[in-house]
């Protein structure tokens, strides 16, 4: 069973988001998602400065099994990407909620967070799959 941290919010497309005090948020894919994908071989991240909308595909995770689009759970501006993933994409597998984060986004509308799942809601989604 996948670990689902209670302090995060989740998208139905298996991304997590952690909002920080400065109005920015960190986004990654869940442990469940990386389990399904398998060993990461490459992660294509968005450009810093790019504006994206909630639900927009903005990155691609390539594993030994498949390439999968990654969607932004909220709208905003990409302010940073995890450059460590360029040389170590396996961090997404080994530490999906920590060192395997994908990008940081400056939120356009914090109200969009209400559209996301809490840990219990995400667990229910995973259980139904």
UniProtKB/Swiss-Prot annotation:
Q: Where is the Lipoyl-binding domain?
A: 24-106
Which metal ions or organic cofactors does this protein require, according to UniProt?
Answer: (R)-lipoate
**What PANTHER family does the record tag this protein with?**
GLYCINE CLEAVAGE SYSTEM H PROTEIN, GLYCINE CLEAVAGE SYSTEM H PROTEIN-RELATED
N6-lipoyllysine: residues carrying this PTM: 65
Question: Which terms are listed as keywords in the entry?
Answer: Lipoyl
Function, as annotated: The glycine cleavage system catalyzes the degradation of glycine. The H protein shuttles the methylamine group of glycine from the P protein to the T protein.
Please give the superkingdom of this protein's source: Bacteria
Instruction: Describe, as the record does, how this protein assembles with itself and its partners.
Output: The glycine cleavage system is composed of four proteins: P, T, L and H.
GO CC annotations on file: cytosol; glycine cleavage complex
Q: What is this protein called?
A: Glycine cleavage system H protein
Gene3D superfamilies registered for this protein in UniProt? 2.40.50.100
Q: Name one Pfam family in it.
A: GCV_H
Q: Which family does it belong to?
A: Belongs to the GcvH family.
GO biological process terms on file: glycine decarboxylation via glycine cleavage system
Q: Which InterPro entries match?
A: 2-oxoA_DH_lipoyl-BS, Biotin_lipoyl, GCV_H, GCV_H/Fam206, GCV_H_sub, Single_hybrid_motif
Paste the cofactor note. Answer: Binds 1 lipoyl cofactor covalently.
């Amino acid at each position: 069973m996948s670990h689902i941290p209670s302090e995060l919010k989740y998208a139905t497309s298996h991304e997590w988001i952690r909002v920080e005090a400065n109005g920015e948020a960190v986004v990654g894919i869940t442990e469940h998602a990386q389990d399904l994908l398998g060993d990461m071989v490459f992660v294509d991240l968005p450009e810093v400065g790019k504006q994206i909308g909630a639900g927009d595909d903005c990155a691609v995770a390539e594993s030994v099994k498949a390439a999968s689009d990654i969607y932004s759970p909220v709208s905003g501006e990409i302010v940073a990407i995890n450059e460590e993933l360029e040389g170590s994409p396996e961090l997404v597998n080994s530490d999906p909620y920590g060192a395997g984060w994908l990008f940081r986004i400056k939120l356009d509308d914090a109200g969009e967070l209400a559209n996301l799942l809490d840990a219990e809601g995400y667990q229910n989604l995973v259980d139904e799959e």
